[in-house]
């Protein structure tokens, strides 16, 4: 459940939960921007004036710049990542006009061989790709040359691997101090899970999302084979699609924050994002605690809704 996830050791160690003055807990910043960290602040005063202020705040209509350019035109992104979460984030940046160069291992991103390449077509849209052996000196020098001219670097290596490859933040900063360096992985760099490999079902289940989308708990009793197949399919449907794209959106948003901070402060920085924190935010409606907090409203077994006034009804 989300309430169990709030005290998860990796969530706590990576700063995804902060203590409130009333003894409760709430989500921390969306990402860890190492030079311009976010401040969640304290709880707002119980004052209806906040609602009036929000209503009166002018809204800016979305759109292109006056010259027709997309918002990230002129921004160069170097992606050294595989599978879905980080590559999809880079594709979102390409949708906003960024030039994205994807560095793949010899033989290509393994995701190209899954699902007949259908998923890969989306996560690699809008990019130019090249295959490089990062463990070779020649390959490393090519990548360092690309880094020198990049605005953003995205990778999804576990802690320690970039340093061994010569592309850790302190190494990259020496040749490009203005770079926005996005480090995205499973559990985060701190805490007991830092060195564990991660696939999407783990953060999806660990942060409470699966239980919420299941509608009811998996029976604890032994099941007949047909019932077991039914529950297996139900588990997969509740956890297969969300965790990676949830993380992609957080990566994209955090990079945009880094680019804005660079524009305002004149310096690049390292940004840390992990799948646990991203999927905690996907469950933000209940990822908090305070005295007297009600239980999370759960959908019924048929997944028709949360209550009599928030559900699907059959109409004739």
Residue ranges and their predicted role:
Residues 78, 120-174, 185:
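A structured beta-alpha segment of the ubiquitous adenosine-cofactor-binding alpha/beta core
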Residues 23-43, 119-141, 145, 203-212, ...:
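Redox-cofactor-proximal catalytic regions of oxidoreductases
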Residues 98, 102-130:
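Glycine-rich phosphate-binding loop and adjoining beta1-alpha1-beta2 segment
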Residues 6, 87, 110, 164, ...:
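Generic structural signal for helix capping and beta-alpha/helix-loop junctions
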Residues 1-107, 173-183, 261-264, 279-316:
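Acyl-CoA thioester-binding alpha/beta core of soluble enzymes
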Residues 13-17, 117-122, 197-203, 289-290:
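Short, hinge-like loop/turn segments at secondary-structure boundaries
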Residues 84, 107, 138, 160-162, ...:
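Glycine-rich nucleotide phosphate-binding loop and flanking beta-alpha elements
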Residues 165-315:
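Active-site-adjacent "lid/gating" segments in soluble enzymes
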């Amino acid at each position: 459940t989300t309430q169990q996830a709030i005290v998860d050791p990796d969530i706590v160690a990576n700063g995804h939960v902060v203590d409130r003055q009333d003894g409760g807990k709430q989500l921390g910043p969306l990402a860890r921007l190492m030079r311009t960290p976010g401040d969640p602040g304290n709880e707002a005063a119980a004052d209806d004036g906040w609602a009036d202020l929000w209503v009166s705040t002018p809204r800016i209509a979305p759109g292109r710049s006056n010259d027709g350019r997309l918002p990230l035109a002129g921004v160069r992104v170097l992606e050294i990542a595989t599978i879905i979460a980080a590559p999809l984030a880079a594709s979102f940046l390409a949708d906003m006009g960024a030039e994205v160069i994807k560095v793949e291992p010899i033989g290509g991103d393994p995701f190209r061989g899954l699902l007949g390449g259908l998923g890969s077509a989306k996560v690699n849209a809008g990019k130019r790709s090249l295959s490089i052996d990062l463990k070779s000196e020649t390959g490393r020098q090519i990548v360092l040359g690309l880094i020198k001219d990049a605005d953003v670097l995205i990778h999804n290596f576990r802690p320690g691997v970039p340093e061994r490859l010569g592309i850790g933040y302190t190494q990259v900063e020496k040749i490009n101090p203005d770079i926005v360096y996005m480090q995205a992985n499973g559990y985060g760099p701190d805490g007991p899970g830092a060195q564990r490999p991660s696939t999407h079902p783990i953060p999806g289940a660990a942060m409470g999302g699966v239980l919420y989308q299941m509608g009811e708990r998996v029976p604890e009793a032994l099941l007949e084979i047909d019932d077991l197949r039914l529950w297996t399919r139900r588990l997969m449907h509740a956890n297969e699609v969300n965790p990676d794209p949830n993380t992609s959106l957080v990566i994209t948003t955090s990079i945009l924050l880094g680019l804005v901070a660079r524009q305002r402060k004149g310096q690049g920085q390292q940004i840390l994002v992990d799948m646990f924190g991203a999927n905690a935010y996907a469950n933000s409606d209940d990822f908090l605690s305070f005295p007297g907090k009600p239980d999370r409203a759960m959908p019924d077994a048929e997944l028709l809704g949360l209550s009599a006034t928030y559900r699907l009804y059959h109409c004739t």
